[in-house]
Amino acid sequence: MASKSADIRPKITLACEVCKERNYITTKNRRNHPDRLELQKFCPRCTAKTAHRETR
């Protein structure tokens, strides 16, 4: 059975919107952010700061 903290804060992968490479793994709080997370992060493949969006 999964722990309570894993249910509330699942691991998510952030993928670059430009090249679709999955660069970052993080956790998020489902209660505060039920929608897909989108952050500005550095993409080493694009060598630029681009939007990274949560993947399923």
Swiss-Prot record:
Biological process annotations from GO: translation
What is the protein named? Large ribosomal subunit protein bL33
Q: Which family does it belong to?
A: Belongs to the bacterial ribosomal protein bL33 family.
Which InterPro entries does the record cross-reference, listed alphabetically?
Ribosomal_bL33, Ribosomal_bL33_CS, Ribosomal_bL33_sf, Ribosomal_zn-bd
- Leader sequence residues: none
Ribosomal protein: present as a keyword of the record?
Answer: yes
Spell out the GO cellular component terms annotated for this protein, sorted alphabetically and separated by semicolons.
Answer: cytoplasm; ribonucleoprotein complex; ribosome
